[in-house]
Amino acid sequence: MKFALFPNTCAKAGKPVFEAFRKSLRYHQVWLCENTDLVPVDVGVMWSVLTNMYGRKPIYDYYKTKVILEVGGLKRNQTWKVAINGINRDAYFGNTDVDDSRWKQFNFDLKDWRKNGDHIIVCGQNPNSEAWDLPDISAWWKNVITEIRKVSDRKIILRPHPRSPVNFKITDSNVEIQQPKFVGEYDKFNFEESLQNAWAVV
C-alpha cells in the first residue's frame, strides 16, 4: 500500500508516535508530505481531528481512507490511539476481537464505588474538539447543574477543559469553578487532588 504521512499536523508530544508509525510502514511505500502536498495514495496519515481543523481539513477531505493518530484516553502521553477515519466514537479501532492483554498492561487497580464524599466533580470538554458534539458548552454546564440539583444538594465543582474555561455566571452558591492547574509535566494537571473526597464524577 501507499501512505502519505503529514508529520506537521502533529502535536509536540506526538512526534515520537508519528515517527514510530512511519517505521512500522517499512514494507510499504511512504511519502512524507507538507500539509499542502496532497499525494494520490491509498491512505493519508495525520494527527488528530479538531472541529476547526487548524489547516488539516484539506488532508482529511482528500483521502477516502485515513489513519488518525491521537493522544490516548488513559495514561495521557504514555498511550496513544491509532484509528481509521476518525477519533473516539467516529473511528474504527480494529478492536472487535481482542483479548484483555492490553488492558492488563495499564496495571490499574479498580476500586469499589464510593458511598460517601463531599462534592461532585463535573468535567468539561473543549468545544473545539471532535470529542464534543453537543450544543453550546455553557448551556451544557447549566443543564448539568440543574440535573444534579434534582438528586443532590452536595457541592458541585465544575472543572473545565484546560483550554476552555467556564464563561458564564454561576448563580448557585454551592457551585465552584476549579480551573485545572498545571503540575509541571507536559499536559499534566492536578485532577488527582480534586478526586480526594469526591462523591462522584460526571
Question: Predicted regions: what is each one?
Answer:
Residues C33-D61, T65-E70, V202:
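Short, well-ordered secondary-structure micro-motifs within conserved domains or adaptor modules
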Residues G14-A20, M53, D136-E147:
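Well-ordered, non-membrane alpha-helical segments in soluble/globular domains
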Residues L5-C10, K142-K188:
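Catalytic donor nucleotide-activated moiety binding site of glycosyltransferases and closely related
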Residues M1-S48, N128-S129:
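N-terminal pre-catalytic "stem/leader" segment of glycosyltransferase-like enzymes
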Residues T65-I137:
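A nucleotide-sugar donor-handling region in carbohydrate enzymes
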Residues V49, K57, Y186-V202:
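A donor-sugar binding/catalytic signature common to diverse glycosyltransferases
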Residues T9-A11, V49-N52, G72-K75, Q125-S129, ...:
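Short, solvent-exposed loop/turn segments at secondary-structure junctions
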